[in-house]
Amino acid sequence: MENIQKLIARYPLVADLVALKETTWFNPGATSLAQGLPYVGLTEQDVNAAHDRLARFAPYLAKAFPETAAAGGMIESDMVAIPAMQKRLEKEYGQTIDGEMLLKKDSHLAISGSIKARGGIYEVLTHAEKLALEAGLLTTDDDYSVLLSPGFKQFFSRYSIAVGSTGNLGLSIGIMSACIGFKVTVHMSADARAWKKAKLRRHGVTVVEYEDDYGVAVEQGRKAAQADPNCFFIDDENSRTLFLGYAVAGQRLKAQFAQQGRVVDASHPLFVYLPCGVGGGPGGVAFGLKLAFGDNVHCFFAEPTHSPCMLLGVYTGLHDAISVQDIGIDNLTAADGLAVGRASGFVGRAMERLLDGLYTLDDQTMYDMLGWLAQEEGIRLEPSALAGMAGPQRICAAAAYPQKLGFGQALLDNATHLVWATGGGMVPEDEMEQYLAKGR
């Protein structure tokens, strides 16, 4: 306890985190893209290479997953305005939200119904391509739908993939790996939902369950993979490949904005609110958004009050050297996808200059907003996907933040607030009814 007091003396906001108070932190260390980019260690060329790789796999995906055929084998989600929800939030919180609120529906992405369909599937495809190229079975000029042939399935069955997950990443990696022909093991933490485990098993995935939290599942997955030279471990805490899979979202979103005639420039700022677990998904997306929109996009991460790992790590500068358990927080939350006690050190250090802020919200707030969104817009999400929904109201309530940016009222009226809905499209009906019953 003495150490916690010392930490609070240096970093006063830690007291609010320990007290499980809903907290908003605006990052005093935020810089321009030009200043912050070198610290990421990845470039626009890396993201373009990821984009090209996904394009090579598009013919394969279109055939392997017919639900992607209409989009030509591209796994991408809709972006919709949510005016009724915006009004409801204003009414519930008594706070005007300047500008327009939009929802990015990664919750309804093809194949696995969450943001993890971006990074998880991309990393599995990257590994498959590498193995096939090295074996001389494929060239980058080939039509990749050839990978559906029995010969390729047999080739990939000699290799295995392992991952540790709270649920959604395991779902995307498990389904994709099994489809390609890999043997795959998903190490699931205690908070993983039963339906996600059942779905994986139906796809022929080996699911190993733990009574412990996310960190233990990842560690055990890593250890198991080390014992087998043909096993590839997908490291959610440190993977640059996963990160790049998420980053591709930036250019695609820019194209969606153009299609819808929406402007993002110095007088039309874009604020984006991303739920954060270990950090790979929101970190990668935020990186891609910064490359696409430059200094006109402002990214915020949202975490449960019981799992504020990235806020704790970035705010103190301790990153992965501190966990929420170190300050007496239990890491137990209904937002299973965000139940992470120790943030990715890679993402925290890469992105700490490119984040405008982080905030926390409690489980009940997520349940309330889950219910309101279903009532007002007819859109059903899982609890973690609502974490971003509290963002616009937090930003609009904080006078000092727009002042610091030099944003007057006219600029705020032109703002777009994009809430990134991370999952929920595949939640079974009975489970969704239970979620809806918990909202007020």
Curated annotation (Swiss-Prot):
Listed SUPFAM superfamilies: Tryptophan synthase beta subunit-like PLP-dependent enzymes (SSF53686)
GO biological process, one term: D-serine catabolic process
Keywords: Lyase, Pyridoxal phosphate
Catalyzed reactions per annotation: D-serine = pyruvate + NH4(+)
Pfam families, per database record: PALP (PF00291)
Cofactor: pyridoxal 5'-phosphate
Classification via InterPro entries: D_Ser_am_lyase, Ser/Thr_Dehydratase, Ser/Thr_deHydtase_PyrdxlP-BS, TrpB-like_PALP, TrpB-like_PALP_sf
N6-(pyridoxal phosphate)lysine: residues carrying this PTM: 116
Protein EC: 4.3.1.18
GO molecular function, one term: D-serine ammonia-lyase activity
Family: Belongs to the serine/threonine dehydratase family. DsdA subfamily.
HAMAP family referenced in this protein's UniProt entry, alphabetically: D_Ser_dehydrat
Quaternary context: Monomer.
Record-given protein name: D-serine dehydratase
Natural source organism: Salmonella arizonae (strain ATCC BAA-731 / CDC346-86 / RSK2980)
Encoding gene (name): dsdA
